Amino acid sequence: LVVAPLRPVTRADQLPLYVVLHGRGSNPAAMERLTSLAAVTGPAVLVYPAGYEDSWNAGGCCGYAHADGINDVAFIHAVVQGVLAEYPAVDPQRAFAFGFSNGGRMTYRLACDLPGTFAGIAAVEAVPVVDCRRLHPLDVEIIAQRRDPLLAIASGAPRKSMDGYVEPTVQSAVDQWRRLDGCAPPATTSHRGTATLRTWRCRAGTRLQYTLYSGGGHLWPHAHGTRPAADGIILPFVRSAPRPAD
């Protein structure tokens, strides 16, 4: 599923590319409905790929794609290259990957295994299940909700498991990516309604932002009352992201 600008565009437009990955058991059309990205991105090309048997092989565990050894890293790389060939107006230095749940896990893997492809990622309600030892600098947004029944939030919280895989806590995932991205303390803390945002400055001018919502569940946060939409957190964050270092 590709959503492109309706008006004619040229190479001079230098549009961003957003690759948006659905969760396990979902699909591209459902992911488009789940988010409001297409309505709020402005001029951009959005791509909603379809995972194998509605899942992604993010490494570590879970789903048909993992069980059958599907090479989703190569698949997403081919998707990006195909879009760049078909839409010359897309700026290859402004490609980003967003994902929810299993799709969020996959964005972590893409950051590790496709260095230089994406300028930034956003993982919503997801922790990494891949052992990433080295990372080319890129912007990273991690979004979680305190009452997510499938994720443990604080470092000392009882860890959750899925399909026999014991997952890291969200805080330990944040700490891991702070190390990988070379982020320096202290964090800058800000608040947007029910969300607390902590932002670190990292290597090569990149940033890591951890957004934690009070309440919530295992879902893509939508705007309601004082709760900001996840889309409104992610897009301002990634728009100024530099391309990963070579």
Whereabouts are the PLM-identified features?
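Serine-hydrolase catalytic machinery in alpha/beta-hydrolase-like enzymes
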Residues: 1-7, 13-96, 105-109, 113, ...
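Acidic glycine-/aspartate-rich tracts in secreted/extracellular proteins
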Residues: 8-9, 24-26, 51-54, 147-149, ...
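Short alpha-helix in the alpha/beta-hydrolase fold that links the catalytic acid
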Residues: 33-34, 152-179, 189-199
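Primarily recognizes the serine-hydrolase "nucleophile elbow" in alpha/beta-hydrolase
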Residues: 93-139
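Conserved strand-to-loop "acid loop" that flanks and positions the catalytic carboxylate
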Residues: 143-148, 154-155, 161-162, 212-216
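Active-site nucleophile loop of the alpha/beta-hydrolase fold
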Residues: 51, 122-129, 145-149
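A short beta-to-alpha transition loop/helix N-cap that caps and shapes the active-site region
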Residues: 28, 55, 128-134, 149-153
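C-terminal catalytic histidine-bearing segment of alpha/beta-hydrolase fold enzymes
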Residues: 139-143, 168, 178-246
